[in-house]
Amino acid sequence: MTFSADDINQTLDASGLRCPEPVMMVRKTVRLMQEGETLLVIADDPATVRDIPSFCRFMDHTLLASDTEQPPYRYLIRKGLN
């Protein structure tokens, strides 16, 4: 799956990090973003396949797209109202 550069406001490369670090970095990055902005997350920890979608649901952000067929995994998140 490809993501258009026009769809991405920020990119976070969490490659090489293991749970819980990728989600902690996503949380920190999203907190500094404006509502509606998008974040492309790149990670290679298999736990992110479960953790990133759960984080989005719990924090009311939108997981616009994901590519989890093989590492590196990619997730496109739109910041919600939090």
Curated annotation (Swiss-Prot):
Active site: C19
Gene3D superfamilies attached to this UniProt entry: TusA-like domain
One GO MF term attached to the UniProt entry: sulfur carrier activity
One of the protein's GO biological processes: tRNA wobble position uridine thiolation
PROSITE patterns: UPF0033
Keywords linked to the UniProt accession: Cytoplasm
Superkingdom of the source species: Bacteria
UniProt subcellular location: Cytoplasm
Record's GO cellular component terms: cytoplasm
Keyword DNA-binding among UniProt keywords: no
InterPro entries per UniProt: Sulphur_carrier_TusA (IPR022931), TusA-like (IPR001455), TusA-like_sf (IPR036868)
Sequence similarity: Belongs to the sulfur carrier protein TusA family.
Function noted in UniProt: Sulfur carrier protein which probably makes part of a sulfur-relay system.
Record PANTHER family: SULFUR CARRIER PROTEIN TUSA, SULFUR CARRIER PROTEIN YEDF-RELATED
Protein known as: Sulfur carrier protein TusA
Species in which this protein is naturally found: Tolumonas auensis (strain DSM 9187 / NBRC 110442 / TA 4)
